[in-house]
Design a protein with these regions (language model features):
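Conserved beta-strand signature within the Rossmann-like core of class I S-adenosyl-L-methionine
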Residues: 178-193
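Short, catalytically relevant binding-site loops at active-site mouths
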Residues: 136, 159-161, 191-195
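A short, conserved alpha-helix within the catalytic core of class I
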Residues: 139-140, 161-174
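A short SAM/SAH-binding and catalytic strip from SAM-dependent methyltransferases
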Residues: 150-166
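Rossmann-like AdoMet
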Residues: 1-79, 83-130, 147
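Conserved SAM/SAH-binding loop
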Residues: 131-137
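Rossmann-like AdoMet/SAM-dependent catalytic core
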Residues: 86, 196-289
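Short amphipathic alpha-helix with an adjacent loop that forms part of the alpha/beta core around
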Residues: 137-147
């Protein structure tokens, strides 16, 4: 993927969380001062002004669902694969967790260069950003081999970009890590196939579902993704595959009562109710060995 595309896709979730006023996202954005608007590529689409609202809903529910599961697991270390410009480091690390962010070179080089702007100088809880291609088993072994404590691995927004063989390579590496050191693997977005269309439909009504295909087409072109090759796109498929690979899998609703979601404040009561009902029918997964 070209450097510019990597930067744009990595910025989207941060921009959405910042627009909602999520505190650590606001601080992270202020520190980074990223340039450009990653949503500009969608400006030509119908309902373009409403699209950020839909995307921010998806960004927040996945981010908060993952965070809640990470805190429940309470493992001392967190490995955030395909971390992008996630503000999760500013939420988790001050609580005493060792945070490691991993992504492709353009993202990790940018974040590492800005470390002094992002983090306090005495941030002992921050283990750093690591460059890793999750589809390269040797790279995964190099990054994961340095860890020696129970860990929560989180993959938010990563699975839809990987082929079946690439997912299996990543899963095998994570399984070996968990067998050695203990911990779990948090997958917040296992119902990716329907999450986007159902969220757009709940927020925008009948016209929402119709725009999803055009949004997907823009994104697929940007990241050079072939949706015909996508697998593990439903929770049932992922549970089956991970079970076959030797994981013990626990499913939980994507949205759980008590989760605080700022995105709901801008919706009508009816739209919020539709959205929550949709999310409660979808899953996140915690896998262990």
């Amino acid at each position: 993927m070209p450097k510019d595309s990597i930067s744009k896709t990595a910025q989207v979730n941060l921009q959405m969380l910042t627009s909602l006023g999520v505190p650590e996202a606001v601080r992270f954005s202020h520190a980074l001062q990223l340039q450009g608007d990653p949503m500009a590529l969608l400006r030509h689409l119908p309902l373009a002004r409403q699209l950020p609202q839909c995307i921010s809903c998806i960004s927040e529910v996945l981010y908060q669902s993952a965070n809640e599961l990470i805190l429940q697991a309470d493992n001392p270390a967190i490995l955030d694969l395909a971390c992008g410009y996630s503000p999760r480091v500013l939420l988790m690390a001050p609580r005493g967790y060792t945070y490691i962010g991993a992504d492709l070179p353009d993202v990790t080089a940018d974040l590492s260069a800005r470390r002094a702007d992002i983090l306090p100088s005495n941030a002992e809880w921050f283990a750093g950003y690591r460059t890793v291609d999750v589809t390269d088993q040797k790279q995964m072994e190099r990054v994961l081999g340095a860890l020696r404590e129970p860990i929560t691995v989180v993959t938010q927004g990563l699975l839809p970009y990987l082929s079946l063989s690439e997912k299996r390579i990543m899963a095998s590496s994570i399984r070996e890590l968990l067998l050695r050191d203990g911990g779990c693997w948090v997958l917040p977005d296992v119902d990716a196939k329907t999450l986007v269309s159902d969220t757009f439909g709940a927020v925008l009504g009948g016209v929402g579902a119709g725009i999803v295909g055009r949004v997907n087409a823009v994104q697929d072109k940007l990241v050079k993704r072939d949706r015909s090759q996508m697998t593990w796109d439903t929770a049932d498929k992922i549970v089956e595959e991970l079970t076959d690979l030797g994981f013990a899998v626990r499913r939980v609703p994507l949205y759980r009562p008590g989760m605080e979601l700022r995105c709901l404040d801008a919706l009508s009561k009816d739209a919020a109710a539709r959205l929550l009902a949709s999310w409660e029918s979808k899953s996140s997964i915690v896998a262990s060995v």
